[in-house]
Design a protein with these regions (language model features):
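Transmembrane-helix motifs of polytopic, lipid-linked glycan transferases
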Residues: 296, 300-321, 359, 584
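Membrane-interface transmembrane helices that cradle and orient dolichyl/undecaprenyl
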Residues: 320, 360-384, 394, 416-423
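Loop-to-helix entry region of an early transmembrane alpha helix in multi-pass inner-membrane enzymes
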Residues: 274-282, 291-308, 328, 343, ...
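Transmembrane-helix signature of polytopic, membrane-embedded enzymes
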Residues: 293-296, 313-336, 355, 375-378
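Extracytosolic helix-loop segments that constitute the early lumenal/periplasmic catalytic or substrate-binding loops
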Residues: 220-272, 279, 523-525, 529
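Short hydrophobic/aromatic helix or loop-helix immediately within or flanking a transmembrane segment
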Residues: 249-259, 270-293, 543-550
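Short acidic/glycine- and proline-prone juxtamembrane loop motifs at membrane-interface regions
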Residues: 339-352, 399-400
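Transmembrane helical bundles and short interhelical boundary loops of multi-pass, membrane-embedded
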Residues: 2-31, 37-67, 237-239, 410, ...
Length: 725
């Protein structure tokens, strides 16, 4: 009975808690939930290759060789070979050759295996990330490539005879091969073996009488078994659901670099994810450790941060506007109108960095607007500490955050100045109170008592003010300086050996200290160095983000009349409204200041809140834009953080219009609306229409080329050659 009462009380408290939230807060919860569910269902599959085999040629110019034994159990010959190659340790854009050959089981008198001189399987050239020569396969890293298709009616070729049970793979450079899968003419996976024990068991009697057979498998590297440890992981398809983008290959490459550690092969080039900080790969490696090197595994952590970013937009909007409704508007527009559904769902650092930067702004704004409470000084000063810790993580994720977070420092300075002014005002109030009391004092003794009380209160106020100021400056230094150094150095430890192999002239004999190495890595974050086959086509000055000058293509598999691509671009209607909102609010701020400030014609009770919100969005917009303004390879893909602040001008403009709207409310579909709300709802309908039209390029699903042209081809002013065809 007692247990039932406790359970009923818990249910009642839960219902009361839910009932205490406004309808807009509940709607915001469902927006965030819907964003995560849609993202989780579309970021990609779970199929992942197992552990990687590290192919290392014996000497420069030689090849690494692995021999497979195929157990053609159903009497069907080899038709297809699928291969998943991870990191290729050559310069980005260079080509590397991989060759497969075949042979029959050698006779008892043969001393060597006679590999086919005709070799119907042949060789393929793989570009590392992309092929600068155009001769290699571009975008192959970490994606599945059908290496061979032997039974082909169009070419009039047939599957390989079952008498050819030995397959040799040769790699022309150091690389990580994640998996190799052999498929017969019936579409079934052929069991394959690389160890002598397994191959011998599959072959049966007569193995020992064929010394050449045993010799071939005896020299196979021990970790060659990793090539066959996840045979049902082949992902077929051209969209991002099945494939990684070339930009994501750098993320996976850096994760592999961490696991590779100090292993080094002379002549290899160990590329790194130079555009992101060391913490980025650590965060994403968590998903890879749990779900493997699958699209879901790499992208789940950035998706979680993107989801948290949408939630933070709601809370920040609520704090800025003092309204759940406008907080919901901010979160909804950002979730569906920005880049969160494209860039935010990929295995890149942008969503993680944007969340930490915005979180830093959020806490520092609370300090700037409210200061430090005299009743709870430590508790309220924690906003400075939390802001700095958020910045520390942002910096370790991407050093360019130091530019984007410059606005946070401005907010701190403004908050500190306001706090000093408030303290000075309290001191003046005490002095005036004492002066007034002395004017009315009937005797000199009472005046001395008043003076003593004033000195006591003034001394207490000075001590209290000094304590609050020390807390603010201490927490600022501890978090923005010490925490940043600590988080950055600690997160760099995992990537240390990859940095050594990238920056040292001779990695076997390093001469650079850890601080120098880390400094080089952080320095390189300020340039866009992760080059792909789309980089030059996507490149656009960051100031072009203001008008959506050029969209960025992250993956394109367009063929014939079928258009298939993932493009990063703001909702055009949202972008244009944000531009109008930015200009409108800038004019408002100028007129407010030009006409006398708080005593001028534009001053109202809402002005302080409006101007504080404008300052936050303007600071964030300018600093996030400047983060990439001087990077030659910057593109719309890099504008995720920028869109957070840019979109913020839409709810700010409508909030400003709404609180000053004197028009009477009329009923529309049973909802009371004034003129401002009617305009907003009309725009939301336009946003929704454009959003639907952009769905194919947002979620990368195929569409007829003509339909793509009219649906979203017009959403970029400058065509990069992939965005529209």
């Amino acid at each position: 009975m007692t247990g039932q009462i406790v359970k009923d009380n818990k249910k009642r408290r839960l219902r009361q808690t839910i009932a205490s939230f406004s309808k807009f807060a509940k709607a915001a919860f469902f927006v965030v939930l819907a964003f995560f569910v849609i993202g989780a269902c579309t970021i990609g599959g779970f199929d992942a290759p197992g552990k990687a085999y590290r192919a290392v040629p014996d000497t420069a110019g030689s090849t690494d060789t692995v021999v497979f034994y195929l157990d053609n159990q159903d009497g069907k010959g080899l038709d297809e070979i699928w291969i998943n190659i991870g990191s290729i340790y050559t310069a980005a854009g260079s080509d590397t050759t991989v060759t497969f050959n075949y042979a029959s089981v050698p006779s008892t008198s043969a001393s060597t295996i006679s590999w086919s001189s005709v070799n119907r399987i042949g060789s393929k050239t793989f570009g590392n990330i992309y092929s600068s020569s155009g001769k290699g396969i571009t975008g192959a890293n970490y994606n599945w490539v059908r290496f061979a298709d032997l039974e082909n009616a169009e070419n009039k070729t047939t599957a390989l005879s079952t008498s050819y049970r030995l397959i040799k793979m040769e790699a022309g450079a150091e690389m990580l091969v994640n998996e190799v899968v052999f498929v017969d003419a019936a579409g079934k996976i052929i069991p394959a073996y690389v160890t002598m024990e397994e191959a011998k068991a599959a072959y049966g009697s007569g193995w020992d009488s064929r010394p050449a057979l045993g010799d071939a498998f005896r020299v196979n590297p021990k970790d060659a078994v990793n090539l066959l440890d996840s045979q049902h992981s082949v992902r077929k398809g051209d969209s991002t659901y099945s494939n990684f983008t070339q930009d994501e290959a750098y993320s996976l490459m850096q994760i592999d670099n961490i696991f590779l550690g100090r292993q080094f092969y002379e002549g290899s080039v160990y590329e790194i994810d130079a555009d992101s900080g060391p913490l980025s790969s650590l965060f994403m490696s968590l998903g890879v450790l749990v779900f493997g090197k699958s699209p879901f595994g790499l992208r789940i952590v950035p998706l979680l941060f993107a989801t948290a970013l949408v939630a933070l937009a709601y809370f920040f909007g609520k704090e800025l506007f003092g309204s759940d409704a406008f907080g919901l508007l901010f979160a909804g527009l950002f979730a569906a109108g920005g880049l969160t559904l494209t860039v935010g769902r990929l295995g890149l650092s942008f969503a993680m960095t944007a969340f930490c930067v915005l979180l830093s702004y959020y806490f520092m704004y609370k300090f700037c607007a409210k200061g430090i409470s005299a009743d709870h000084p430590v508790k309220t000063a924690l906003t400075v500490l939390f802001s700095g810790i958020a910045f520390a993580f942002a910096f370790a994720l991407d050093a360019k955050a130091v530019i984007a977070a410059a606005g946070v420092v401005v907010l701190f300075i403004v908050g500190a100045v306001r706090q000093h002014r408030a303290q000075a005002a309290e001191e003046r109030a005490l002095r005036e109170e004492m002066s007034e009391s002395n004017l009315k004092a009937p005797s000199e003794e009472i005046m001395k008592v008043n003076l003593a009380e004033y000195e006591e209160k003034s001394s207490a106020l000075a001590a209290q003010s000094a304590y609050k100021n020390k807390l603010a400056y201490l927490f600022f230094f501890a978090s923005f300086v010490l925490a940043t150094v600590i988080v950055t150095l600690l997160s760099s430890l995992a990537s240390y050996f990859s940095y050594v192999k990238f920056y040292e002239a001779n990695p076997e004999k390093p001469v650079l200290g850890i601080f120098t190495i880390v400094w080089y890595a952080l320095r390189d974050c300020f340039t866009v160095s992760n080059v792909t086959s789309y980089t030059s086509a996507n490149a656009s000055n960051a100031f072009g983000w203001l008008i959506g000058l050029k969209g960025a293509t992250l993956l394109s598999a367009t063929e014939g009349s079928s258009y298939l691509a993932l493009n990063a671009q703001m909702n055009t209607a949202v972008m244009l409204t944000a531009l109008v909102g930015f200009l409108f609010m800038t004019v408002y701020a100028i007129l407010y200041l030009a006409t006398g400030g708080k005593n001028g014609a534009y001053a109202t009770e809402y002005s302080p809140r409006i101007l504080r919100a404008y300052a936050v969005f303007a600071l964030g917009l300018v600093t996030s834009l400047l983060s990439y303004a001087f990077s030659a390879n910057a593109s719309a893909m890099h504008s995720l953080l920028f869109t957070v602040f840019y979109i913020g001008f839409i709810p700010l403009a409508f909030y400003t219009a709404y609180v000053h709207d004197k028009s009477g409310a009329t009923s529309v579909l049973g909802i009371k609306m004034n003129a401002t709300v009617k305009v907003l709802f009309a725009l939301l309908i336009v946003y929704a229409v454009v959003f639907v039209l952009m769905l194919p390029m947002t979620f990368c699903f195929p569409l007829h080329a003509t339909a793509a042209k009219y649906c979203f081809g017009w959403t970029t002013f400058v065509n990069n050659g992939f965005y529209r065809i």
